[in-house]
């Protein structure tokens, strides 16, 4: 009897500070910051109650519990897992020490830290009056049984659905299109992982057969023009809203604006490959690195029609094997137009970043010297990338002043193009956002999860050399991606659009019935898609 009493006494001795661990997790789950693994937490709870007869055993038990507790907390959070970190190891090792320290500091959510301290103080104040372990155990038991009574606290993420209007593009069998279109509806309940996986495979198969229509050749009498594509790193629609720049007057000068354009990824390398392979439907992330498909390579298709290729960067293209990947995975043959530019920023990996306006003006000198009747120029800018700082400064510069400086340079470039009288199709198509605001599942500046805030980017088109175009932009309100943009370029060529001052056809006709693409975004270790009015997330090989 004495032995049983001693055992019971040790059992009811309580969890001690582990109560704070569990209670904090319960609150974080209620707020949507965690996805609580109930049975794993029960196992940890019970393990902590096991008796330890010696000091050495008690220390060992606490060390084991500490390791398990940290691993469990990490797995329940939305933080990148080990697989994601390893997949991005090459890029991470390029970060400067100063940038890493700033990321760690900025990662801390001070409101949550203060809330945790408050819970700790309450625990110390209450532990002499109530059995806190009993409260924690009852709370955990409630979380286990409450789903059976329909009162479980929400563990849903903050991936807010924002359904856009539009119709599914035609071109495949009716039943496949209908199956994809069904996902545009709404549903009160949640879809199963098996249902979403099946729909995703249907989506990928459908997209694989879609190809943008380009003319076979250009007639000798057709009016020549230049195509300029600005691929901008770290600029989403949500970033512009957060920086109060969404209504900047520079954007009002554009003729076409895509309101729901999905870049389909949140990293630069895959974004570049998706753009360069944008003359086809949307491939999976893994397919970007498979066998090349020449019919998808928009720069090479334009080259075959007589558009001379040029490439301009405000960086070296070395980081993360960026330039080499574009050449080997997307067949980019454009010569890299190098010049010694004035330095505007120093990047997170200590690389010099060129002055934006200087890069723009280099284009004019290159095309004027080349004297090609038609050209297509791809620009890639990283001036807005997180972690950039002014030369000589140690602290990174905020997004908003860098974005304003970039837009100001763009405004000057637009004015230069207007003065030049050149016929130009200027296209802005950002890679992805900077995650200026973040959300409950991902802190600001982190882009491991390609959420809608990061992948919905402000794509715009402006025509130069035509003086009778409408003053107000035409908005494309359906869900679109790179295939729609490639199709638009094909229509501009096919209609000989620059042959008349008002355009060969109305702008509304150019964008009418452009191919739509369902909102599906992927990185190597995370996927986000919209299905029946809700956004779903899949981490690595897990469940939706």
Predicted segments, located by residue:
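Phosphate/adenylate-binding glycine loop and adjacent helical scaffold
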Residues: 497-544
